[in-house]
Amino acid sequence: MVRLILFLLVSNFVMSQSYYVYVASESDDTVSLLKFQNNEIDELERITVGTYPTEIEGPHGITVDPNGKFWYLSLAHGNPFGKLVKYSTESNEILGETTLGLFPASMQVSITTGFLYCVNFNLHGSMKPSTVSVVDPVTMTEITTITTGSMPHGSRISPDGLFQYSVAMMSGELFEVDALGLEVSRTLDLENKMIKKDVTKHSMDGMKSMDGMKHSMVKPTWVIPHPKKNLAYIAGNGSDEVIEVDLDEWKVSDRFNTGKGPYNLEISPDAKLLIGTIKSEGKTAIWSLEDKKLLREIKNTTSVSHGIAISSDSKYAFISVEGIGGEPGIVDVISLENYELISSVEVGKQAGGIAFWKQENL
């Protein structure tokens, strides 16, 4: 009898967990606040963002402050510059904003400096080096910009908050920024030199634009530092692979194949799993980080898999899926214990940036 009572108490505790996620819908100028509980995900609120009701301003990147009190949103479609907007998680109301660069995209806040680091993707501009904007989120002031590569994306901070990492999609490089010194500390070419030996001269010539600038075959779109080891993992969107980089040696330590068009990557907080969206196939892949074995590929609810947010207890992955045409976006919930899709909810069109907010015990 005692065992039965304990079982029921534990079961009730597990079932009473609730998880909250924010997701941006780029073609609708909305952000949805979602709640996942008892294996069901629901939309609690749909927040209209942007200033001009007749224009699509393109909410792209979204992140929650480490203290959970604020969320930040990049509006990519500016005239010409985009901007960063700060919101309260308590009320989902605007608290401030600042202008950034061309097509501001992904971002994170450092737990050490308190600054927010946002890459300016420059999607529609000429293929030349762009920047990382460094913002004081208290005053919402852009402190400085740091020049990196062409079409930088995937801005992520090291677990200790001392370094910011991003990849340049068109120049095929990994950049490490000193979060305290506010300058590029190291740059790594991600191209596979072994492949280059076998490609034709015509293919190599095609890697350069008319102005002589390199066009990457790897086309990296995301980087995520390992939470416990000095490693980072990069999505090779053009080369259909994940690239592992040893941050101590500052060199590529491994490559493994994926489906077509890996886009975003995240690592579970317990450091056991690597999750990747396979954008061109509308799938989500799960790998064991211990041996890099593919554990499961899961078909998403609709097409164009995009972003990933993982719960703080490493039990669930929340996947934003853009959809095509006039379809609504979708957020899929995947169990990281049995590798199955367990719930989905419709949000605004072209669901993209996604961020985990909090977990609560009811």
In which residue ranges do the predicted regions lie?
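Predominantly soluble domains enriched in secretory-pathway, periplasmic, or organellar proteins
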Residues: 16-362
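Sec-dependent N-terminal signal peptides
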Residues: 3-13
